[in-house]
Curated annotation (Swiss-Prot):
Tissue expression summary: Mostly expressed in stems, and, to a lower extent, in bulbs.
Lineage start: Eukaryota, Viridiplantae, Streptophyta, Embryophyta, Tracheophyta
Annotated residues for binding of ATP: 216-220, 265, 337-339, 359-360, 364, 448, 463, 554
EC supergroup of this enzyme: ligase
Function, in words: Produces CoA thioesters of a variety of hydroxy- and methoxy-substituted cinnamic acids, which are used to synthesize several phenylpropanoid-derived compounds, including anthocyanins, flavonoids, isoflavonoids, coumarins, lignin, suberin and wall-bound phenolics.
Chain spans, region SBD1: 290-359
Taxonomic source organism: Narcissus pseudonarcissus (Daffodil)
Keywords: ATP-binding, Ligase, Nucleotide-binding, Phenylpropanoid metabolism
Catalytic activities: (E)-4-coumarate + ATP + CoA = (E)-4-coumaroyl-CoA + AMP + diphosphate
Family per similarity comment: Belongs to the ATP-dependent AMP-binding enzyme family.
Gene: 4CL2
Pathway: Phytoalexin biosynthesis; 3,4',5-trihydroxystilbene biosynthesis; 3,4',5-trihydroxystilbene from trans-4-coumarate: step 1/2
Protein name: 4-coumarate-CoA ligase 2
Region (SBD2): 360-427
Amino acid sequence: MITIAESHPQIHHSPPDTTAPSTPPTATIFRSRLPDIVLSNHLPLHEYLFENTLTSPSPCIISASTGRSYSFAETHLLSRKTASFLSSRCGVRRGGVVMLLLHNCPEFVFSFLGSSMLGAVTTAANPFCTPQEIKKQLLASGATVIITQSAYASKISRDDDVEDLIVVTVSDNELERHAAPPEGCVSFSEVESADEDAVPDAVGVGPEDAVAMPFSSGTTGLPKGVVLTHKSMTSSVGQIVDGENPNLHLRKGEDVLLCVLPLFHIFSLNSVLLCGLRTGAAVVIMARFEMEGMLETIQRWGVSVAAVVPPLVLALAKNPLVEKYDMGTVRMVLSGAAPLGKELEAVLKGRLPQAVLGQGYGMTEAGPVISMSPGFAKQPTPVKSGSCGTVVRNAELKVMDPETGFSLGRNQPGEICVRGPQIMKGYLNDPEATSATIDVEGWLHTGDVGYVDDDDEVFIVDRVKELIKFKGFQVPPAELEALLLGHPSIADAAVIPQNDEVAGEVPVAFVVPSKSSDLTEEIVKEFISKQVVFYKRIHRVYFIHAIPKSPSGKILRKDLRAKVASFSS
């Protein structure tokens, strides 16, 4: 069995650049507007989450599809039963790895928490991944158990590489529940008869032990296992929701959080599920996104806090179905995972005037939250449109000049770097990638271009690798995308570089027209040309039915680049 204990990433750091000046400028370090707090990051994650909520009588987890709710005590009990099942039936021990190949469901919650109780590690994957992608993550992570819905069991390889693998299947409905599991699989229903008092003693699980291993987005390279420890995850949740004036104020026994974003993505896992568990708020779980189903869920359960990504903001802002439902209970809309344009913010605020709309910013490797709007705090402060808020408490942020490596001051764009107890331990078995991401001083280099303004607010300009170079000028795609979405006949858009013999690269746009629009390439080009400097003008427009995006809402630019390359060949 490959275990994290046996294969901790060794964090090697590159030697300092001896060509740099010996006396670089004094670094400008940015911190939160909110004061630091005492973090309870010495506790194992599962103990920390239930520390103040175990006796709460209010709902903890609600299944939108079945209507069943679980109290905090029931959630804890079923998680202990799952831990017992994983140990006695599947042989999982401290340091072992469990893979979750699940759509959002209560069993995801019980499996994640149960693994933590054993001192084991979970790695989650998208059930829509191909069998080859699933096998690649399975082998890379060293998982010995996969928990999945019955419909996806056939995707799991049973060749010699994974012959000892145990596949546990979750039933999607009552009919499946009473049927035998697929051949060679174990039914998750066995959890119900497991002895919750037979959980092996997990004493010795320390803050630096791994608890989760998400695989980082493959949008800029090959996916890599990100080792997040108990300390990483308790720190990140604490930075957001703990203290007398939490950055994200969730009300115990009152708030209902919408969990429609996939739990296999760190944004939903951290900022929805774990924050809800810690604060005593209810989490209503939707198996997958469907517009009318989401609106019905918000209305039925009185959702008060909606964590979304820009594509959902776009749907909430422009889809006429929204007008059919009562959205009056929504008091906060938190957008993350990808940049949100000012124009889209304004449209949504017009539709949900009672709600506070704001952004958070993060990345998997950062644990994940780096900054969050203080407009969500118990004692809120105003935030500018387009801002990602201020850096979270108990962390530091600096902006680095990519050319010189020197720290930059306010209002100067550069690479965002973050340091704090929440960042990853490293990439699994990849010391070279780890040392390229976390420097000798503990700064995690995000690869994102941004700046901090005079009010300590963080603004993201773009990804370093996504910047378009037009005759040496830098063109940020996110800026042009935000402008395009401001056109009433454009439903969605993405901008990427296209190679050009003269300019090197030119910006080209993929546009999804609104229904029954008369949009043409010239109309789009002219619309942008009126708003930008010459080198930011759109050179080509490709009309498309949908912009390809990851489950977290990030534009899959490499897919669009492949389309452009096919047009040229």
